[in-house]
Amino acid sequence: MTNIRKTHPLMKIVNDVFVDLPTPSNISSWWNFGSLLGLCLITQILTGLFLAMHYTPDTTTAFSSVAHICRDVNYGWVIRYLHANGASMFFICLYAHMGRGLYYGSYAFRETWNIGVILLFTVMATAFMGYVLPWGQMSFWGATVITNLLSAIPYIGTTLVEWIWGGFSVDKATLTRFFAFHFILPFIILALAMVHLIFLHETGSNNPTGIPSDMDKIPFHPYYTTKDILGALLLILTLLMLTLFVPDLLGDPDNYTPANPLSTPTHIKPEWYFLFAYAILRSIPNKLGGVLALLLSILILALIPMLHTSKQRSMMFRPFSQFLFWVLIADLLTLTWIGGQPVEHPYVIVGQFASILYFLLILVLMPVTSLIENKLMKW
């Protein structure tokens, strides 16, 4: 008799994803991040659910309700900090996952890659709205500054901003709708992640060499379930270390001051995972130009499959492209650092150089280098 996992309509789906999935035999630990992102998402949904049971989305009580969660709710402080630091872990895994895709040419799976870009936008929107909810100083001013960027859109900008705010400033209506969106978006992310997987399983996984591996596949279970559990344990360990030892390491002290529309913080900045984009936004002295650069810095990812000029898929055997890839990573780290610095010399000029280099690398240097490598291969 056939095993029930292969015949039962629901178990068959799970089986095809986690058990009998043919997987390349040579994928490295960089392929762990997909499952880790799934784990992060489940953790965030669960901790978020318990936080929502005690949180009140009202300007007068939001800050107090977060303090109440931390002080009076059983293990409320653990849930709150798991959720806050879980977001940081989510983005670490997300950026590692994208870096892997860039390095090994996984973007050649166009549908999977494009759904991934949409997922990135959705996760960024969710994280931004979540940051507004504690209603601290940085929550309020972050929401004001970022939503205000939409006013740069010609003709409809101001109307659009006031429509999003639900009034003439960030207020009760804004907080309520942000809470509603912050609650629903993770479930949309979950659905999109399933679509992401469906598209991936149409083609099968890529591998470090970028060469088709149809002749050398192994079942996902037990090989990669075991490998993924190791990654999951390391992720959980890191998250617990952050939460229990340095819960505020990645946060902003300003957010422990209740929101005050009459007092602007000295330096308004988003969470660390948005700083690279924030630095690109600030490096252009024109409002509309900055907003466009900010959008393009993420949207450029959708162009990457079209910018691939190499005859090889992966960068594994392309040393010049590898060098430029690591320059790009260094550039993004520089932008992240600049985004957290005040707007003064020399940070402004460094940020402008780093922003130009970011676009130059992706749009010009990497495609041209790939063409040169193609020529060198003929020698």
From Swiss-Prot:
> Which terms does the record give in the GO molecular function aspect?
metal ion binding; ubiquinol-cytochrome-c reductase activity
Recorded GO cellular component terms are: mitochondrial inner membrane; respiratory chain complex III
Which InterPro entries does this UniProt record tie to the protein?
Answer: Cyt_b/b6_C, Cyt_b/b6_C_sf, Cyt_b/b6_N, Cytb/b6-like_sf, Cytochrome_b, Cytochrome_b_C_euk/bac, Cytochrome_b_N_euk/bac, Di-haem_cyt_TM
- Note the topology in the membrane: Multi-pass membrane protein
Q: Report which superkingdom the organism of origin falls in.
A: Eukaryota
Q: What is its main location?
A: mitochondrion
Q: Which residues does the annotation say bind a ubiquinone? A: 201
Q: Does the keyword Iron apply?
A: yes
The cofactor note from the UniProt entry for this protein is: Binds 2 heme b groups non-covalently.
Q: Which co-factor is required?
A: heme b
Q: Which residues cross the membrane?
A: 33-53, 77-98, 113-133, 178-198, 226-246, 288-308, 320-340, 347-367
Give one GO biological process term: mitochondrial electron transport, ubiquinol to cytochrome c
Enumerate the UniProt keywords alphabetically: Electron transport, Heme, Iron, Membrane, Metal-binding, Mitochondrion, Mitochondrion inner membrane, Respiratory chain, Transmembrane, Transmembrane helix, Transport, Ubiquinone
According to its UniProt record, which protein family does this protein belong to?
Belongs to the cytochrome b family.
Q: What does this protein do?
A: Component of the ubiquinol-cytochrome c reductase complex (complex III or cytochrome b-c1 complex) that is part of the mitochondrial respiratory chain. The b-c1 complex mediates electron transfer from ubiquinol to cytochrome c. Contributes to the generation of a proton gradient across the mitochondrial membrane that is then used for ATP synthesis.
What is the recorded name of this protein? Cytochrome b
